[in-house]
Amino acid sequence: MKKIIFSVLAVAMIAVVTAFKPAPGAVGKMFPEMVCENYNGQAVHLPVDTKGKYTLLAMAFSTAAEGDLKTWINPIYNKFIGKVDASKADVFDVHMDYDVNLYFVPMFTGFNQLASKSSKDKIKSKTDKELYPYLLFYDGGKTYNDELEFKKRDTPYFFVLDKAGKVVYTTSGKYDDNKMEKILDIFEEN
């Protein structure tokens, strides 16, 4: 009986891990060309405009992904955008300046394109002005499901690109320290 329960638990755990597994098929491939728009309405071409620096892209298709995406905001801000106040830091506060590109990319495709203007305005109104340089909008017919292996619309996806625009790491879902540690390891090694 114990063997059966253990086997069922093992299969269930494998199913859960597989369901939340990032898109490994994208790793090692060039990030597909994507034209986005920055906060000021100017075109930003991914990955062309990011070449020369490592890049972290956070991409979401729907408001259903917003909850998981929000779990990343503070850790990303604290690591890459915010500055440590030296007067309040103690000896254990270690801050490293990362020279990387960072973009949050809400994606408006298919039916969502019809509401993209109002959705963009809503996102802009709720976004801290300090984060405007890190916000891009994709508004297009192409979903990139095949190239980037997006499995769920209610999940945010994260891509680390090398200096040439090749995907070197992917993850998805809620923030956890292990995911951030892998991202930081890549940035620190390069």
Q: Model-found features: residue ranges?
A:
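Thioredoxin-like thiol-disulfide oxidoreductase module
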Residues: F111-D154
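Structural microenvironment flanking redox-active thiols in thiol-disulfide oxidoreductases
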Residues: A65-D128
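Bacterial N-terminal signal peptides
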Residues: S7-V16
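Thiol-/selenol-based redox modules, centered on thioredoxin-like
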Residues: N145-D146, R153-N190
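Solvent-exposed loop/turn segments at secondary-structure junctions
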Residues: T63-A65, F108-N112, G141-Y144, V167, ...
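Short active-site neighborhood of thiol/selenol oxidoreductases, capturing the structured segment around
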Residues: L46-I73
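N-terminal "domain-start" segment that seeds a small globular fold
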Residues: K21-P47, D68-T71
